[in-house]
Structure formats: C-alpha cells, structure tokens
C-alpha cells in the first residue's frame, strides 16, 4: 500500500509528463534535469516509452547512480561543466525531449537550450511565482517548443490501473523509491533526519 501512495503524485507527474504531455516516441532521445522522485519517474517513463537514449542530469552522484536503475543510459554531473554542452557532446545536435524536474530559472532555460531542432522541452518543476525565464527568440525558427506539465497531464482512471500493471510486471520502479519506512508516531523525527 505504501508503494501505491507514490503513484498518486510523483510517479503520475513524471511518467505522465513523458506519456501524455510530451508523448515521447520509441527510439527518441531524452534528457531529464533533476533526479529526485519526479525526475526518476520521468526516466522510468522514458524507458517504458521505448526511448533510445535517456540522459540523467543532476549534481548529486548517488542520485545519478539511482537514475541508472530507473533506465538512464547516460549520466551527467552538473558539477562537471555546462550540462547543455555535455548533452550536445553526447548527441551531436541535442535531444528530442527534455524534462526539467527542479523548478529553477537556470534549469528551465537549460532544458530549452539542450533540445535539437523540432524538440520539446517540458517544464515540470515549480518555478517560483514572478520568476521569468529567458529564451533566445531565434530558436523558435527551428520549431523548438517549450511547455509546462501539471500532474503529468494525468488521466487517473486510465493511468492508475496502467501504472499498477507496470509495477506488478516489474517495469515501474516503486520499491527503489522507498528509502526507509517509519511509523506515524515517528514522523517529526523523520523530517529532522
């Protein structure tokens, strides 16, 4: 039951953004910025969608290692230089789909900058109210797109049973997201930890 709770928010948001908002196609190239729960769910969703290359980007090495478990084919540590340049080195011309799962101005701009001509950047992270992102206007001549995603554009009646089936088939990684189980009486201590 505790794993089912994960589907209700983070997994639905990440996998749904891949399936519904961006509609990632088999064989495509994907980059995910931010490897927390939603970012890992994007990576898992991209693998389920049949993406040919999935690039995980984060600044925490342990999160990048976990991203491999969820389906990342390549990892980029943001501490090692410009992630946009690193994505371009790996792909030649950028990715077809990028997902921003942090909620920062800089990472939203990077998500747009790392897509190739005709690519789509999907911003999932909650950028603070009043913050504006800046994009190069000429990039739109290359038919690049940027969009937001709210709860993965979910369709709960269809998605929930489908995600449960993926989990039962060993394709949706929920167990790996649970780092520790605690009793309700210990919740305050868990927040401190």
Regions flagged by a language model, labelled:
Residues 60, 127, 152:
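Residues in the short beta-alpha loop(s) of Rossmann-like NAD(P)-binding domains
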Residues 23-25, 92, 103, 116, ...:
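Short conserved AdoMet
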Residues 119-122, 134-176:
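Rossmann-fold dehydrogenase core element
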Residues 13, 38, 46:
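Hydrophobic/small residue at the entry helix of a nucleotide-binding pocket
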Residues 81, 93, 109-113, 117, ...:
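C-terminal hydrophobic helical "lid"/dimerization subdomain
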Residues 1-33, 168, 172:
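NAD(P)H dinucleotide-binding glycine-rich loop of Rossmann-like/cofactor-binding domains
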Residues 29, 52-54, 120, 145:
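Residues at the starts of beta-strands that form the adenosine-phosphate
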Residues 32-35, 47-110:
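Adenosine-nucleotide cofactor-binding segment
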């Amino acid at each position: 039951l505790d794993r089912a709770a994960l589907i209700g928010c983070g997994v639905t948001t990440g996998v749904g953004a891949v399936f519904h908002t961006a509609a990632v196609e088999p064989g495509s190239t994907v980059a995910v910025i931010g490897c927390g729960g939603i970012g890992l769910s994007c990576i898992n969703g991209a693998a389920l969608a049949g993406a040919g290359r999935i690039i995980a980007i984060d600044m925490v090495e342990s999160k990048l290692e976990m991203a491999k478990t969820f389906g990342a084919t390549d990892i980029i540590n943001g501490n090692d230089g410009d992630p946009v340049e690193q994505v371009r080195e790996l792909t030649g011309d950028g990715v077809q789909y990028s997902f921003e799962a942090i909620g920062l101005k800089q990472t939203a701009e990077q998500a747009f900058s790392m897509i190739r001509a005709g690519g789509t950047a999907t911003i999932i992270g909650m950028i603070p109210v009043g913050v504006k992102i800046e994009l190069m206007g000429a990039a739109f001549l290359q038919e690049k797109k940027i969009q937001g995603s709210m709860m993965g554009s979910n369709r709960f009646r269809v998605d929930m049973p489908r995600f449960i089936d993926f989990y039962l088939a060993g394709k949706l990684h929920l167990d790996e997201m649970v780092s520790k189980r605690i009793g309700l009486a210990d919740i305050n201590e868990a927040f401190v930890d």
